[in-house]
């Protein structure tokens, strides 16, 4: 198996972050070929020729936004002797534009089949696939490459966090649809003030941070919200999850999320909103909470978690539930797609 990735993934005007490149070493046990320029049609031709010469039986295209449709379409059209399967994270992005109606249909036509990472995404694919090609869904496997479960105290020390507090973790890029504003409002609920809590926001802001800072100030939260506005490198991910008591994803819209699968690996209870495919992965009352998407329901779940000390029960269940999400199972779904 060979992995083909990008020399240029996004042009700078589409990428609001500080860098789109991983700074750590590449995995030593994988053959990774950096050769795809997402914006250069001449490059697509050359890459397709190279891939064709390798005579692969199967090519899996990881698809998550419409921007990549022209590049992927051009590659797939030239791989005439290779079966092309789309591994679909999102068929339609969370923040839609006119291009999201124009670009995906051509990509869908060039694929021989589809594996979606949630039922809701599978439904989106089915609406676009007029040829009724083979398709299935399989949840994203657990992300197990970020390190081991370690003592909470060690993680807090590494992050410079006070161990007298319990931590709610909001992890990942901050965008409007992810509902951090709802979480801040929920966290300000007076019923939670009797507990020693801190909200830890770890991720780069992809939009104006000022409205969030104003909300924190207006609710009088002050030092109760700790913000680490930066892309979190792989080697630091374990500290944030090992430090957390609960991982909160208060999304306003979603299909599925890799954050849940990191939380499963580190056996951390989760609070998600019941939008998209999130509640498929986080059964309510088993490994955490799947609640209505509004601040009041989020606050109610947080209160239940800390008031009734649900942590140990959820962790026991997490150890059982996470066995469902193996990479072998996803591979079998892809290989058996008919």
Where would I find each of the regions flagged by the language model?
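N-terminal strand-loop element at the rim of the active site
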Residues: 1-53, 121, 135, 207
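Conserved acidic donor-binding segment of nucleotide-sugar-dependent glycosyltransferases
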Residues: 284-296, 303-309
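Acidic anion/phosphate-binding donor-loop and adjacent secondary structure
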Residues: 97, 126-127, 141-158, 165, ...
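Donor nucleotide-sugar binding/catalytic pocket of nucleotide-sugar-dependent glycosyltransferases
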Residues: 109-149, 336
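Conserved donor-binding/catalytic core segment of Leloir-type glycosyltransferases
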Residues: 161-178, 184-187, 199-200
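Nucleotide-activated donor-binding/catalytic signature segment of Leloir-type glycosyltransferases, i.e.
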Residues: 210-238
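Short hydrophobic beta-strand element within catalytic cores of glycosyltransferases
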Residues: 264, 269-272, 282
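Acidic donor-binding loop of glycosyltransferase active sites
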Residues: 239-255, 268
């Amino acid at each position: 198996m060979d992995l083909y990735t990008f020399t240029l993934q996004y042009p700078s005007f589409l990428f609001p972050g500080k860098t789109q490149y991983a700074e750590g070493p590449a995995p030593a046990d994988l053959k990774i070929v950096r050769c795809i320029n997402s914006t250069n049609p001449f490059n697509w031709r050359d890459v397709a020729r190279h891939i064709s010469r390798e005579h692969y039986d199967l090519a899996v295209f990881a698809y998550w936004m419409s921007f990549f449709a022209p590049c992927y379409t051009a590659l797939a059209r030239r791989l005439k002797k290779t079966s092309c399967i789309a591994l679909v994270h999102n068929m339609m992005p969370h923040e839609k534009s006119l291009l999201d109606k124009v670009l995906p249909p051509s990509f869908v036509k060039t694929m021989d089949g589809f594996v979606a990472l949630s039922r809701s995404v599978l439904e989106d694919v089915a609406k676009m696939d007029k040829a009724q090609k083979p398709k299935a869904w399989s949840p994203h496997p657990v992300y197990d490459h970020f390190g081991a479960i370690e003592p909470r105290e060690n993680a807090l020390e590494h992050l410079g966090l006070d161990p007298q507090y319990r931590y709610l973790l909001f992890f990942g890029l901050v965008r409007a649809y992810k509902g951090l504003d709802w979480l801040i409002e929920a966290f300000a609920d007076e019923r939670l003030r009797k507990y020693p809590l801190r909200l830890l926001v770890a991720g780069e802001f992809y939009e104006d941070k000022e409205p969030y800072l104003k909300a924190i100030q207006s609710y009088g939260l002050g030092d109760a919200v700790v913000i680490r506005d930066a892309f979190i490198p792989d080697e630091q991910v374990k500290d944030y999850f090992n430090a957390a008591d609960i991982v909160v994803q208060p999304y306003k819209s979603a299909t599925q999320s890799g954050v849940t699968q990191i939380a499963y690996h580190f056996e951390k209870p989760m609070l998600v909103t019941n939008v998209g495919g999130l509640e498929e992965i986080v059964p309510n009352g088993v490994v955490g909470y799947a609640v209505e998407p509004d601040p009041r329901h989020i606050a109610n779940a947080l209160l239940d978690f800390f008031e009734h000390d649900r942590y140990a029960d959820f962790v026991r269940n997490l150890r059982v539930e996470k066995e469902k999400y193996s990479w072998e199972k996803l591979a079998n779904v892809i290989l058996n797609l008919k």
